[in-house]
Amino acid sequence: MLARSRVCLQTITRRLADFPEANAIKKKFLFRKDTSTIKQLKGLSSGQKIVLNGWIEQKPKRVGKNLIFGLLRDSNGDIIQLVDNKSLLKGFTLEDVVQAVGILSLKRKLSNEDADEYEVQLEDITVLNASNKKPAQMQDFKLSAIYPPEFRYLQLRNPKYQDFLKKRSSISKEIRNSFNNFDFTEVETPMLFKATPEGAREFLVPTRTKRSDGKPSFYALDQSPQQYKQLLMASGVNKYYQMARCFRDEDLRADRQPEFTQVDMEMAFANSEDVMKIIEKTVSGVWSKFSKKRGLLTLDSKGTLVPAKKENGTVSIFRMTYEQAMTSYGIDKPDLRAPDLKIINLGEFNAFSHLNKKFPVFEVIILRSAFSNMEEYKERWSFLTNNSNYNYRVPIVLPIENDEQANSNWFENFHAIATFENPHLITKFLKLKKGDIVCGCTREPNHSIFENPTPLGRLRQLVLQSEHGKNIYHAVNKDVASWIVDFPLFSPVIIEDKSGKKEKLAYPEYEKDRLCSTHHPFTMVKLKDYEKLEKTPEKCLGRHYDLVVNGVELGGGSTRIHDPRLQDYIFEDILKIDNAYELFGHLLNAFDMGTPPHAGFAIGFDRMCAMICETESIRDVIAFPKSITGADLVVKSPSVIPESILEPYNIKYSNSKK
């Protein structure tokens, strides 16, 4: 221990060199408290003495022998000009932290139409902490507000990111107020849990505890509070919520982080309807208060976009079944800002796929008036046939170049994957025109659609993510919400391709007679399908519900199983979990001691904040996000741990070089 302390002290000595002079340090802590923000100056009169804290926004500029102009930025991101007649700003640099004292004065107007602006006649300025030259060297990054990730703290000083963090805080308060008004109790649950097969990979935490057989013991960081909140229902907590920290060792992308926040809730003596009503009111309230688009839209029974919040104050969000979503939009989280951009099943016209009997449906989606000439088509739509954009097969994409093609032989381009009994009837139905794009592909039959998204569902998603697609097909510049209900309770297990071949599989392949939970194993089956559990569980629908906004899953929930025998049957007989009691005995025991019926939901809080702040990545609304590789580049984590420290945890490096 002494040796380690010595190393640390030596490191500090090398970095800081001499002991700092006392007055220089003390001065940084002796600052005035009677300060204002720049916004508060609007209520003051010219000639008043003021004190401002902030940062030097730009390097001060000498404009005369006894005149220097500087800019001060306060913690709100507001900026005011400093007028220095005493050369007080001499030597100051970008991002110095200062306290400025001066006289408030009106800035000279260039014209009578200009609004009043203030400046400060500087009397004194104190450096509370000087900046090095790094911020000045990164001036170009400051202008774009895109800094290297290791300088995240500089990026967060930008008003845009300050606004994101403040709005996130305000949204959190609003959600808490909403649940408190519904008489929920906020309860914190443990983050150190145990490893269980809930879906995603877990982060494991080693301990110094050994089992009786000598094997090391590990915690798992909680993927979600799912099991703890069900135990709270068993504990007599009637309505629970928390802003929960969750951890999943997943492949990362713009809308994923290894640690994230979810708004978690659960209700005893409740079903799906009870939960959905509260979520509708809470989410709608947040959108109405904080979104620049002022509220959510949804669909009515005719498919027309209407406000989710009615004039009488009630909130009702459209419900779409999983089957409807997959057949009309090819994905279980459809972007309904383009409600009329639908996929068409040509089976009604006796057009079928002949390549794979498990994928017999041939369907198309028509991109109307998508281009004016072939040069524009190639420039704007080439990504639709990019193999890397799809999990499996790529749709056939056909631009309609002229009216003759539209009215006669377009379907010949799809003969490789489909058979047409009456192509002329289909042509009459589709009413193709020059400038349209016909996209066609195959999928599984209705009631058995597990490939999600389908190729055309993915194509539609790509279209609506592109700027040109948004401009053409979005019906509104608003946020559109829908519920997706009646999911399959179980899904076939996809066989992972471990062949090492560069060519992708054209179709997903499933393991025979093996199922996994579509969401998680605690979801209750729809009562009308209960008898199917015994013989044909793959045909059962679950009492699960997802809330989708703009093609993004904002959250999901379900009515839970609270009967121990049914839960055990699903673990053992359907999911084939051999050690179910070892993994889930705590739940089964609680269920066997009078756990009430319960249902719940979880909202992806980071995702919600990103949508309301109108930014593509959740990283923008998280103070210190992880990179695409899962690293925190500010603090340089994760890091290598010396083997001597790992030893008490019963962990050794393999192939370690000593």
From Swiss-Prot:
Any one Pfam family match given in the protein's UniProt record, by short name? tRNA_anti-codon
Q: Which GO terms describe its biological process?
A: aspartyl-tRNA aminoacylation; mitochondrial aspartyl-tRNA aminoacylation
This protein's source sits in the domain of life called Eukaryota
User: Known Gene3D superfamilies for this protein?
Assistant: Bira Bifunctional Protein, Domain 2, GAD-like domain, Nucleic acid-binding proteins
- EC annotation? 6.1.1.12
Q: Which reaction does it catalyse?
A: tRNA(Asp) + L-aspartate + ATP = L-aspartyl-tRNA(Asp) + AMP + diphosphate
Intracellular or extracellular location(s): Mitochondrion matrix
Q: Give the molecular function GO annotations.
A: aspartate-tRNA ligase activity; ATP binding; nucleic acid binding
Instruction: Give the start-end ranges of region Aspartate.
Output: 226-229
Q: Is this entry keyworded ATP-binding?
A: yes
Q: Which residues bind ATP?
A: 248-250, 553, 604-607
Q: Would you tell me the Gene Ontology cellular component terms?
A: mitochondrial matrix; mitochondrion
Which cysteine residues pair off into disulfide bonds? Answer: none
PANTHER family according to UniProt: ASPARTATE--TRNA LIGASE, MITOCHONDRIAL, ASPARTYL/LYSYL-TRNA SYNTHETASE
- What is the additional note? Present with 1550 molecules/cell in log phase SD medium.
Family annotation (NCBIfam families): aspS_bact, PRK00476.1
Protein function: Catalyzes the attachment of aspartate to tRNA(Asp) in the mitochondrion.
Protein name according to UniProt: Aspartate--tRNA ligase, mitochondrial
Gene that specifies this protein: MSD1
